[in-house]
Amino acid sequence: MLQLIATPSNALADEPVSIRAIGLPPSQIVTITATVKDEKENLFQSKAFYKANEAGEVDLEQASALGGDYVGVHPMGLFCCLKPKRAFQRLIKKDVMNSPLCICLDLYDSVCWLETVRIPPKASQIVHRWFAGPGVKREQIREGRVRGALFLPPGKGPFPGIIDLFGSIGGLVEFRASLLASRGFAVLALAYFAYEDLPKVLLEEDLDYFEEAANFLLAHPKIQQPGIGVISVSKGAEIGLAMACYLKQVVATVCINGPSAIFDFPLKYRDLVVTPMRLAFEKIQFHGSGAACFRHCWDPQNMLNPPKILPVEKAQGKILFIVGENDQCLASKLHAQRAMDRLRSHGRSSGRMLAYPGAGHLIEPPYSPFCFACWDSVLGKPMLWGGDPIAHAAAQVHSWREIQKFFRQHLLQSGGKL
């Protein structure tokens, strides 16, 4: 009897799944597909074609995909290569506490490459991908000006505390924070515009707001002293790096594909005002899909005005730069290299860079679907993020391990629990 087996069928979203088809005729060509809908009913799909071995089995841990959305041996390729049916959609789990992403795996005993040809699958399996582990708690935060959601691991603590910042997407994005909490960190997913009573659009980087958030987190009884970490991406990584430079509360910072200077919006902190460098919009390029490529608009070669460059040498903690070498939003490797060079020129060894060939801009937790481009509501156009799906997927797996290792090394003190 034909069977499609996925184990575990119920797991955290950052855990791998083993997929096997059994009971096939020897050398049978098959199609395996993955399908999922987000909370807005947007459909995402992937497929790959395989040949059964002499025992009538296809084990994705060993079998090489002959074609489809990827080729070669990629056990989680169906998850990483999920693509939106409607162009420029990004798969983001909103409700991370109450429901999983339900991914349907289907097995067909032929090559099914035309969407218009509908035949019933020979076997199916539902895989539930959760974003919060057992015992993780979520607290809605409205404290002073601070708006966000705090995720706490099970247990008494104290736990190493982290602030999680996303970029120009705005609002409150929680899936990374909840997964980190499932791994033993207390994480504040922090909104800073386009959420509740916060500014509807980003007009300035108010570092006093982020210091208020850091103080709130450190004052929480379940947060380990004396300092916190920051994980940040894109525009959030610009803010994260500024926090590392100016806030003594921050002792470990992860910057994912962010600039090393202040761009587009002024940075304000107490009496300090840093006027931004302006994006060179005349350098925007358009991909064949119509998505806008901003990579050349943030040219670090033109960063000749020292006050606009973030003074990384002032950072009291450690900084981990994670960069995708095929990032099409900005030249993130060049920016990280500039920051590393500046640290070295001041005799500092507190920075480290992980560069991933083939990875794009949106480096997220493992097995998150690769997003090459998606709609930007502020621009009113799709943004190009770049990357190769398989190389990007490998970067997500490796960087997630390194991020956790980095925070454990630099946030855990005697008496802390993880």
Curated annotation (Swiss-Prot):
Gene Ontology biological-process annotations: acyl-CoA metabolic process; fatty acid metabolic process
Family annotation (Gene3D superfamilies): Acyl-CoA thioester hydrolase/BAAT N-terminal domain (2.60.40.2240), alpha/beta hydrolase (3.40.50.1820)
Enzyme class: transferase
Origin: domain of life: Eukaryota
Enzyme Commission number(s): 2.3.1.-
Biological function: Acyltransferase which efficiently conjugates very long-chain and long-chain fatty acids to taurine. Shows no conjugation activity in the presence of glycine.
Name of the molecule in the record: Acyl-coenzyme A amino acid N-acyltransferase 2
Source organism of the structure: Rattus norvegicus (Rat)
